[in-house]
From Swiss-Prot:
Gene: rimO
Listed cofactors: [4Fe-4S] cluster
Stated role: Catalyzes the methylthiolation of an aspartic acid residue of ribosomal protein uS12.
Cellular compartment(s): Cytoplasm
UniProt cofactor note: Binds 2 [4Fe-4S] clusters. One cluster is coordinated with 3 cysteines and an exchangeable S-adenosyl-L-methionine.
Domain Radical SAM core stretches: 200-430
Protein name from the UniProt record: Ribosomal protein uS12 methylthiotransferase RimO
InterPro entries: Elp3/MiaA/NifB-like_rSAM (IPR006638), Methylthiotransferase (IPR005839), Methylthiotransferase_CS (IPR020612), Methylthiotransferase_N (IPR013848), Methylthiotransferase_N_sf (IPR038135), NA-bd_OB-fold (IPR012340), Ribosomal_uS12_MeSTrfase_RimO (IPR005840), rSAM (IPR007197)
Enzyme class, first EC level, given as a word: transferase
Family named by the database record: Belongs to the methylthiotransferase family. RimO subfamily.
């Protein structure tokens, strides 16, 4: 009789040696924080975390399923890690994250190498899934930092009872009743300052998730079903976590959430994000406190003024606009249009003269006509945005847009994506050239991946991992420099997305 697989499995007998657990974390920084929480839970209960899958007794793949390419990468990675059960020492393969919320039964049925699954709302179940007994933590701090930057880079590059509360019978954007294996409950897990984390980022920076879930009705998105309703962490909890991180040597904190500009609304806070930024900027040890993912109509005057007035808050905003044509935005259930966005951008730049603006657009959304796309191109020319990402529309079953007609052919979607990226490349090149001769603080990230003769870093204009780099070539071999140090530099060269600088 074949063995029946459950979403949480336990070992019959405990092992005397600590189990080595390897993690592969895919997707966005929000997913990375989930991985850090699961690693923290494992580490404080006796497991040893490794970045080398070939050395692991247990392998965990934390998946993304936001778009088709992310789903495919997740499946490919699961299959790759499954090979370690056949050829290496790995005894158990656990799949976690968004893919589990969407395809729980299918994963267990079609990938027999998978021993357990852990959804986004049940991170604490990673202990039972790994066969590790909970024990009282003896650590004074809930944070552990991986021993080396290279180890954290390897981690990110790919190597019971559900704690979700009472069942919710939601319709519309929260409906999960037709999902394969999805439980009736929406995820409602939210970590706090006492939750252990193993930081997978370099020791000088960290992400803090200030909220989870999303209430926006965007028709192309299934995040509300994957992550649940929007819910903010307590103000004091975020501050306590930031203070503890700063005492451990973290210099740059990035606040993240599906929509950080909604932070605190569910707690009754007005301008919650602005208040939080103001408070965190008072932490002496921190160099920068930035945030990502601002919803366009949630940006307040106080938030803009807070960014403008505080030197510790980078003059940088990531505001995903998704499109500029009113017709497309209406079908996306986003509202507004290009003229409104241009006025908003004008106001942002008036209050914050040196603002660096990042946004993202979706091309090929159902019903996007050639005229709509041309409007988007004209908007990009007019807005002169600093950093821009372009995504090809991905038809996601479960999203409202899945049922829309007037689908754009894949070849046409790709043509539009390339055209818009080509247009933005010229804008980016011009904006980078305008920086030559200007001086900036640069936080060092380490020797360049291209050559040991160069060091690479970021200015406040560069968010971690998503924007360009600053290359510095005048460090003497004998100089004792370390990642995380900040140097004043002058920009000497500009390329399409990257800069070259010299020390001052």
């Amino acid at each position: 009789m074949p063995e029946t697989k459950s979403s949480v499995s336990t070992l019959e007998q405990p092992e005397t040696k600590p189990k080595k657990v390897g993690f592969v974390s895919l997707g966005c920084p929000k997913n990375l924080v989930d991985s850090e929480v699961m690693m923290g839970l494992l580490a404080t209960n006796g497991a040893e975390i490794t970045a080398r899958a070939e050395d692991a007794d247990i392998i965990v793949v934390n998946t993304c399923s936001f778009i088709d390419t992310a789903k495919q990468e997740s499946v490919d990675t699961i299959l790759e890690m499954a090979g370690h059960k056949a050829t290496g020492r790995a005894q158990k393969l656990i799949v976690a994250g968004c893919l589990v919320e969407r395809y729980r039964n299918e994963i267990q049925k079609n990938i027999p190498e998978v021993d357990a699954v852990v959804g986004t709302g049940e991170l604490e179940a990673i202990l039972a899934a790994s066969g590790i007994e909970p024990r009282k933590s003896e650590a004074n701090s809930p944070f552990v930092i991986l021993n080396s930057t290279s180890a954290s880079q390897q981690l990110k590059s790919g190597i019971a009872d559900r704690p979700e509360g009472a069942a919710r019978e939601e319709a519309g954007r929260f409906a999960r009743t037709d999902w394969d294996g999805a439980v009736a409950d929406l995820p409602n897990y939210l970590y706090d300052e006492n939750t252990p984390r193993v930081l997978a980022t370099p020791k000088y920076m960290a992400y803090i998730k200030v909220a989870e879930g999303c209430d926006h009705p965007c028709s192309f998105c299934i995040i509300p079903q994957l992550r649940g309703k929007f819910r903010s962490r307590r103000f004091e909890s975020v501050v306590a976590e930031a203070e503890r991180l700063a005492k451990q040597g973290v210099k740059e904190i990035t606040l993240i959430g599906q929509d950080t500009t909604c932070y605190g609304e569910d707690l009754g806070l007005k301008d919650g994000l602005a208040q939080l930024l103001e408070r965190l900027a008072q932490i002496e040890e921190l160099q920068w406190v930035r945030f990502l993912y601002a919803y366009p109509n949630k940006i307040t005057k106080r938030l803009l003024q807070t960014i403008a007035d505080n030197p510790k808050i980078p003059k940088y905003m990531d505001v995903p606009l998704q499109h500029s044509a009113a017709n497309v935005l209406k079908r996306m259930k986003r509202g507004a249009h290009g003229d409104i966005f241009l006025k908003s951008i004008e106001e942002m730049r008036r209050v914050i003269p040196d603002l660096t603006l990042r946004t993202s657009f979706i091309v090929g959304f159902p019903g996007e006509t050639e005229e709509d796309f041309n409007q988007l191109c004209e908007f990009v020319k007019a807005a002169q945005i600093d950093w821009l990402g372009v995504f090809s529309y991905s038809d996601e079953e479960g999203a409202k847009a899945f049922a829309l007609d007037e689908k754009v052919p894949p070849r046409e979607i790709e043509r539009r994506r390339k055209k818009l990226m080509s247009l933005q490349k010229q804008i980016s090149k011009k904006k980078r050239k305008a920086l030559i001769g200007r001086e900036f603080d640069v936080i060092l990230e380490g020797p360049s991946e291209e050559t040991d003769l160069l060091w690479e870093g970021r200015t406040a204009m560069h968010a971690p991992e998503i924007d360009g780099k600053v290359y510095i070539n005048d460090f003497a071999e004998h100089e004792n420099v370390e990642p995380g140090q900040v140097f004043r530099c002058e920009i000497t060269e500009a390329h399409d997305y990257d800069l070259v600088a010299r020390l001052l």
